[in-house]
Design a protein with these regions (language model features):
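Intrinsically disordered, low-complexity segments enriched in serine, threonine, and glycine
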Residues: 1-117
Length: 117
């Protein structure tokens, strides 16, 4: 990764937060979710035009939604059936208001590389 790579750990007490992308172009992001309970459902808003819903994930599975590679994996295996969204996540230039329902049910990390046009 380069010096413009930003990993963001989501504190379980937080359900809403902001990400400031200092770049001039949308930056595809990678979301890693490790559930603390089976079959949790999580809804993420602010990283796509429509909400991203994640479901059918078991405790301690590692779910990766990779906007750059356009993949959804659970424990390194295809898991697109657990992903319900029209597009892959990205961080827009400027301030992004992100909201995650049931954030306390998982450990969540969002990563992106700043992009410039």
């Amino acid at each position: 990764m380069n010096e413009n790579y930003y990993p963001i750990e989501i504190n379980e007490a937080e359900g809403s937060f902001t990400i400031v992308n200092g770049g001039t172009a949308p930056a595809p992001c990678k979301i890693t979710i490790i559930p603390k309970v089976d079959f949790m459902t999580l809804t993420i808003t602010g990283l796509s035009d429509t909400p991203i819903e994640v479901s059918r994930v078991k405790t301690n599975d590692i779910l990766v939604i990779d906007g750059e590679a356009r993949q959804v994996l659970i424990n390194d295996k295809d898991a697109f059936s657990s992903y319900n969204a029209w597009e892959f996540p990205k961080v827009q230039p400027g301030v992004n208001k992100i909201s995650i329902t049931n954030a306390s049910q998982a450990t969540i990390q969002i990563e992106y590389d700043t992009r410039y046009i």
